[in-house]
Design a protein with these regions (language model features):
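Switch/connector loops and helix/strand junctions flanking conserved nucleotide-binding motifs
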Residues: 145-147, 178-181, 205-212
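Conserved BB-loop
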Residues: 121-159, 174-179
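Arginine/glycine-rich "motif VI" loop of SF2 helicases in the C-terminal RecA-like domain
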Residues: 125-129, 187-198, 202
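Conserved TIR/SEFIR loop-to-helix hotspot centered on a Trp-containing motif
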Residues: 40, 174-191
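Inter-motif core of Ras-like GTPase G domains
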Residues: 167-170
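Short, highly selective alpha-helical patches that border small-molecule cofactor pockets
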Residues: 109, 113-117, 182
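Short beta-alpha junction loops
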Residues: 142, 174-175, 196, 200-207
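C-terminal interaction surface of TIR/SEFIR-family domains
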Residues: 2-35, 64-88, 92-95, 114, ...
Length: 268
């Protein structure tokens, strides 16, 4: 069935999820009655806006959790159930909209990942600012790193299993295929059924893709300017970004490709 939901509705669902998380944080505070009332009203408004009363299979999922969200007797577990239900609905109904990008790459391909991150920011993907997370996370670039003392694989799994819709960009290369850590990341993407783009680095080919993930999903060579145009257009739709001035985009794209050509992949 064609997706008839809007990015504005996606944002509203995110706001309700944020409200539920805030309600959860201060749940032990006896004065949080008003936050529970507000959460119940807002969830009710969301149900009407998304027409979930007549939407199956989402109907049972939301109604079970909606019915137990009573502001007088609501327990912490009840709010957790609501968060779980809304997250499931978000991933089902808004599968073509995304909150974040995960770049899965070999640390030996760091220089290429760095250039890609710069290109993504030029397209409009948000940077980390003023202590707030941006829309990109990966394992080897300052500002986007996994926190110190965190287990990389477990942290990535937790991010992929969060309430966020995550789009994974997999930078396939010989380095990637020879890295146990990278294959663990690919396994996490497969287990969580996360949407992904196969991006083929200059030293690699489509025929060499193997492992957990579907090799038939359409990807592109990272230095293919026409495929980069299509990639940019898709990101604008996925993240509801403003259209770019085409001349500026062409300059950014061509600069990106030129910088890639100056990176000696074999010696990374």
């Amino acid at each position: 069935m064609q997706n008839t939901y809007t990015f504005e509705q996606f944002q509203k669902l995110n706001e309700v999820l944020s409200m539920a998380k805030e309600c959860l944080k201060d749940f032990d505070n006896q004065n949080n009655f008003e936050s529970r009332c507000q959460l119940r009203r807002t969830v009710g408004s969301l149900i009407e806006d998304l027409n979930l009363r007549n939407s199956s299979p989402h109907k049972r999922r939301i109604y079970y959790n909606w019915d137990i969200l009573n502001e007088y007797s609501c327990k912490k577990q009840d709010v957790l159930f609501v968060i779980e239900a809304l997250t499931g609905i978000k991933k089902d109904l808004f599968a073509t909209f995304y909150d974040k990008i995960f770049i899965s790459h070999s640390e030996k391909d760091y220089a290429i990942a760095k250039e890609l991150i710069s290109l993504l920011h030029g397209i409009g993907i948000k940077k980390p600012v003023n202590g707030l997370d941006g829309q990109i996370f990966c394992s080897s670039y300052d500002g986007y790193l996994i926190p110190l003392r965190e287990n990389n694989t477990e942290y990535i799994k937790a991010q992929l299993d969060s309430t966020d819709n995550v789009l994974s960009l997999i930078l396939y290369s010989k380095n990637y295929m020879n890295s146990a850590a990278c294959l663990n990341e690919a396994g996490a993407i497969w287990i969580k059924d996360i949407s992904f783009y196969p991006i083929i680095l200059p030293d690699f080919s489509f025929e060499e893709i193997k492992g957990f993930l579907n090799p038939n999903i359409t990807g592109f060579k990272i230095n293919d300017k026409y495929k980069l145009n299509e990639f940019k257009d898709n990101l604008i739709k996925y993240f509801n970004l403003q259209e770019l001035n085409y001349n500026i985009w062409e300059q950014d794209r061509d600069t990106f490709i030129s910088r890639l050509n100056n990176i000696n992949v074999a010696n990374l």
